[in-house]
Amino acid sequence: MNKKLTIEFDFKFDMIFADPPYFLSNGGISLQSGKVVCVNKGEWDKGKSQEDMMAFNMEWLRLCRDKLKDNGTIWISGTYHNIFSVANCLTELGYKILNVITWEKTNPPVNISCRYFKYSTEFVIWARKMQKVPHKFNYELMKELNEGKQMTDVWRMPAIGRWEKTCGKHPTQKPLRLLVRMILASTNQGDWILDPFSGSSTTGIAANLCGRRFAGLEKEEGFCKLSKARREEIENLNNQNILIGHIDDLHFLESSDMVREMPYGDEIPFH
């Protein structure tokens, strides 16, 4: 995350979602669609020493804290490879951890080694910027989404479906369902959301569908092109409706709460 890029934003954000490198690309293999595949994601995801990982996480979390409103919150996804480092950095920087969400995948990949339990979860830390400044939490909406019961910190959702790959896919792409729930839980209409590791801009697509505004940072040109294609795809109302039809949480919103004309790319040019 480049400090010079964050300076371009002369305002602060209501929410940040970050999907930083997990540093798990170590030459391992997995099974996908009946085929053995390598789990390496790219050079940016190759393992680091504990010291290097801590320094990396400390730097980008410090920059994010500077761009977050005092009542803002940040969501960070990870696995055991990086999530403990992230939690330590959050605490040292003065954030207050609110929850650690367990995302239980309903369609996890097969464990072909049969030497340990099958990995079926990822984690998402939810933290606020300040220790004593109240944060936004749309409690009643979350309760409504959960059939009138309190929403727990275990969310059962599938990984990305084919309907999310129509423009191509990112190797660590998160499902729209996951981002929509975070956004609905912690932001209001018109709020600004930042993703410092934007990838294919799933956060941006989810933000737009929920009526929020979005800015993302991404250094890989190929992923920027993929993001632009995905944004252009949902400028078509039929394509919007297809996505909305797959995301149960959006069915609870009034149609007036969802954006029909895309705001992201207006205030800040798309790069």
What label would you give each PLM region?
Residues M1-T6, A229-D266:
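S-adenosyl-L-methionine
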Residues M1-L226, F270-H271:
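Core catalytic lobe of class I
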